[in-house]
């Protein structure tokens, strides 16, 4: 064999072995595991915990990769490849999932990378695959990536795709729980204050007019060619839930839906639905990236941000980008505006038609309107090189008089000419004509005219009539400006005072001002300003002569006269002032006299003197007799004295110091300082040393103390305050008696507090100040008067502390109540400026409810122990709580309780963002079981539920109501709605109403409630609406005794409440009953109360008949009441039917009109019955005076057997009844004694004698 053949054979064998090795390593499970094992060993920083399966089901677990600046931890990676697809020349991946991935990248620790040279563009990019690629499932679960200060977290993501040639289809995709936390923008350091410098014009600066001319000389939209996308993309459905972006702004997207496709440059948006914390967006549309680039987009949005909450936006974009683009915007809600625009972006000059229309615009958008513009029309037509602008509107507001505004203007890219801007208001008009030009410098020329302005109707307390003319011109170029007012005229009168303003002035940015003369006259008062302020020389005089300021302006009064002169140069100015004012008044403030006398010069040093004297300052709650300020000296040595005499504050201080201009340093002392205040006198114990260093922007305050008879506040060491510093303040003593002037009469406090504050800061570094504050109380006692009874609360220990260190804020407290329990706790907030994570605990031990017993009446009490052990977690946006709160042995006995409560329990268990409630309320008869839960995982959409279920719980409201109730109700609460559903059964009840209180009167329909300022109060409505759907079932053993009616009630009522108010639906029946009135004994034969709406407007259907046993001739006579409770209709009926007179006779007398009984006897019986019925309340009052309870006067019997009966209780269990016949004068004496609650012994003495034993039954 030749050498060539041997070499060829060797090469062939090597290639075959290499291919076989690669095939073994890649194509077999064993080989694949060997590859990962080698990578685990040889790749620096890579660690793979477990490898299972092959290509069809490959799983990698516990993967770690560490490199400088990069740390990757992967819990599980799964890959499933469909190898059978390879035979069909396609690539199929059945599953690619990543779980529990954590990536941390710190770019500062990464080595610098090599700079990559940018590749030159090689023409349009086309992406295409020669073989179909199918990715059936892609899944991400619990992915966390942190790059420097940016964090991205994904809770769950599933998707899939198909890629064939240029067509890429994204299968239905779901994304849940995305969080992108961006770093907040660092606060810009405070800039140092520097002297203003005048910026001179730059000759090479391009004028604005030339810039705009170049911009509009060619189309705004550049020449556009057809765009060919490298792929045809089809997103079938992309759904997202709970997507959140945090940082400087916090945005939460509750749901997202996207359907979009792009084929050969034809874009189609089938759906874009976004529901976020800031609003909702729905959009559809089409666009073509070729030819004229036609577009058709429709967008609807609802905003959820203040002040435009609830604003609806409709946007329509049509036309073509390269021809005419049409835009329509409709805003409705707090702001109602319609906008229509047509623009040709591809033409030079930018042809544009714009129209804005609004029927009404108000500010603020919600709440009370302070400003309103009606019928606003704005129109712009033409090109930017030649356009016409017009605007019309009518405005009004709280501080704005009604006015009509019109504007007509023309302009181009170099100037705008305001032909007329007219404001018609106050019975006159104001016109502005102006020309603004920016071809070279920005210059203007304008003329403002006031014609016939009259404020008499708008401000009747300050009527004025004004006319005037103001002309102005000026220019601005390169940061330098100049302005001139060649004519200023204003004439008229203000409240019978002549007004005259006349003058002219001019100035520039070099602070050169020339005032030839400025004269102001208001009635007898005048002021004049004349002079120059040049670059160096100063020569300005200002005089004021105001002998009659009374009523010159509303609330102004007094006299003033003075002179101010400015002389010298800018480097060495001199100020001379001599001003005197007497009897000054402004609104409720009055000053008897003000005198200012000063002479200040500035050469190499500022020196001079200034004296200010103010006498008798008075306004509500303030009465200052004298204030004097005296300052004199120079920079090197100066002093200031301030004296105040009056109420509520008086005192004095002395300040002396020196200033070194070279070092920009001032040093001084504050001494002889004391003040008298409503909380007592304050004074210094030593002079305060002050040192201000201007170059360092720092001030030092020496140690000192402030003392008060009830307090002492000390600074034990020097405070250096500047960009950084530290301050320590000790509160050695603070007696709560100081707070008495500020506390209501119903609150009293005593005790002493002491504390300390130590705070350090450094504004040159990011973060919050560092420090701590402690406060400790001794013998602290607070007494609050409740219901005219004192409620004392004494503390054995009362400590509060606050700490801020290492980017963590903490608040702690320790409270020990005298002869009671204790409350301890601490709350921590980590990273207060960032994530604001919560931590801490709250503990309550053996807190006894008996501490409120002092406010209860005699015989009333409260008992029970409150214990809690709670732990805080989560963050401020999503707080969490863990632990339990228990209330055991709760027993509240009081007249205000509707039931006799027995020891009961209540417990709440907290588990993160959820809690549960269990409890039982025990009574002497029956118990109520409580259960419930709450959820605040979404703090803005919290939810709470409480259910109550009981059986025959006795409710007593003495002395009128006793009933048994069996509730089965559920109360649910959300931020937007309260609901109450369920059923309440009343199987047994006794309702007794003897009489209404004398003071009980109905509320007038025109009642008006006034507040403390005697202004009508607005009716208060519930912040959260209440909906109820409650059924009340009245059982067969419910009886009522009220106003002579004794009856049994049955029926069902449905209690419903919504935004319209409370309503009742249902029927109450009276199957049996008796009604005693006007001496007659009526039986309820039929009784129905129909409810359908407001509870006080039932429909009545009641029939009451006279007792047939007391009616002759077997006649049934009665009264029928029908109609509504507001307008009932009563009629008399009889059976058999007869005339109204005959029926009335049977109803009142029990006999017909043709009866043989004497009419006088019958009439006597009837009148006595009517009179006795009306005298019940008077007789009852007489009985109470003589110690007889329930004394009553009534009639009994019919016809000749009629009697007048007096009855009453002379002892709690002994009733005496005495009756005398009306016609036979026979007397009957009855004694009834109660042996047991329902067992009576009765003795009757009259014509006959009897002794009876009676027992009362209830059915």
UniProtKB/Swiss-Prot annotation:
InterPro entries membership: TamB (IPR007452)
Subcellular location: Cell inner membrane
Domain of life: Bacteria
Classification via Pfam families: TamB (PF04357)
Topology term for the membrane: Single-pass membrane protein
Residues that span the membrane, as ranges: 7-27
Family: Belongs to the TamB family.
Function: Component of the translocation and assembly module (TAM), which facilitates the insertion and assembly of specific beta-barrel proteins into the outer membrane. Promotes the secretion across the outer membrane of autotransporters such as p1121. In addition, is involved in outer membrane lipid homeostasis. Likely transports phospholipids between the inner membrane and the outer membrane.
Membrane topology, Periplasmic segments: 28-1259
Keyword annotations from UniProtKB, A to Z: Cell inner membrane, Cell membrane, Membrane, Signal-anchor, Transmembrane, Transmembrane helix, Virulence
Disruption phenotype: 50-fold reduction in ability to colonize mice in competitive assays with wild-type.
Residue ranges annotated as Cytoplasmic topological domain: 1-6
Subunit note: Interacts with TamA to form the translocation and assembly module (TAM).
Record protein name field: Translocation and assembly module subunit TamB
GO biological process, one term: protein secretion
